[in-house]
């Protein structure tokens, strides 16, 4: 088998395709969460704290000198990223929890024994008939007090 055909067999397996779709959706979801945190959650939170814009929160380690930009410790952006992570982690946790609950319900569901096929039913009937035919005859008992 050539490397190309092996790769093709690997790439079209259901799990790999599902994983790729999950990664793409996850990346899009990450952008949505980042926008939600940066544009919806942080502005009101900054307003409650006293009109603070979290994206501007930083400690200047070295001011800008000439064409060299300032060296900043941007802890406000870090706070936003931590909040992003918490929201994404919570969403993933809830998804995994729902999937695990569904798996437990599937495991609890009683599985009915498979119905026998027509061939199996017919073979069972033949077996039962053969057993009946091959039964030894019941022993005949003669009562000596009874006339024949």
Curated annotation (Swiss-Prot):
Alphabetically ordered keywords of this record: Cell inner membrane, Cell membrane, Ion channel, Ion transport, Membrane, Transmembrane, Transmembrane helix, Transport
Subunit structure: Homopentamer.
Transmembrane segments: 9-29, 79-99
HAMAP family registered for this protein in UniProt: MscL
Recorded GO MF terms: mechanosensitive monoatomic ion channel activity
Designated gene of the protein: mscL
Domain of life: Bacteria
Entry's localization field: Cell inner membrane
Organism for this UniProt entry: Pseudomonas savastanoi pv. phaseolicola (strain 1448A / Race 6) (Pseudomonas syringae pv. phaseolicola (strain 1448A / Race 6))
Family from the record: Belongs to the MscL family.
Name of protein: Large-conductance mechanosensitive channel
Keyword match rRNA processing: no
PANTHER family according to UniProt: LARGE-CONDUCTANCE MECHANOSENSITIVE CHANNEL, MECHANOSENSITIVE CHANNEL MSCL
GO CC annotation terms, alphabetical: plasma membrane
InterPro entries: Mechanosensitive_channel_CS (IPR019823), MS_channel (IPR001185), MSC/AndL (IPR037673), MscL_channel (IPR036019)
Function summary: Channel that opens in response to stretch forces in the membrane lipid bilayer. May participate in the regulation of osmotic pressure changes within the cell.
Pfam families found in the cross-reference section: MscL
Topological type in the membrane: Multi-pass membrane protein
């Amino acid at each position: 088998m050539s490397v190309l055909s092996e790769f093709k067999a690997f790439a079209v397996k259901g799990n790999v395709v599902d994983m790729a779709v999950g990664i793409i959706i996850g990346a899009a979801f990450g952008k949505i969460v980042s926008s939600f945190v940066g544009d919806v959650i942080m502005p009101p939170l900054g307003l409650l704290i006293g009109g603070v814009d979290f994206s501007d929160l930083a400690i200047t380690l070295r001011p800008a000198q000439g064409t060299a930009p300032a060296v900043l410790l941007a802890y406000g952006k870090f706070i936003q990223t931590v909040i992003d992570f918490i929201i994404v982690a919570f969403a993933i946790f809830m998804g995994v929890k729902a999937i695990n609950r569904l798996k437990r319900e599937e495991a609890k569901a009683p599985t009915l024994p498979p119905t026998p096929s027509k061939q199996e039913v017919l073979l069972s009937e033949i077996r039962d008939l053969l057993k009946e035919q091959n039964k030894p005859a019941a022993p005949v008992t003669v009562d000596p007090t009874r006339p024949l």
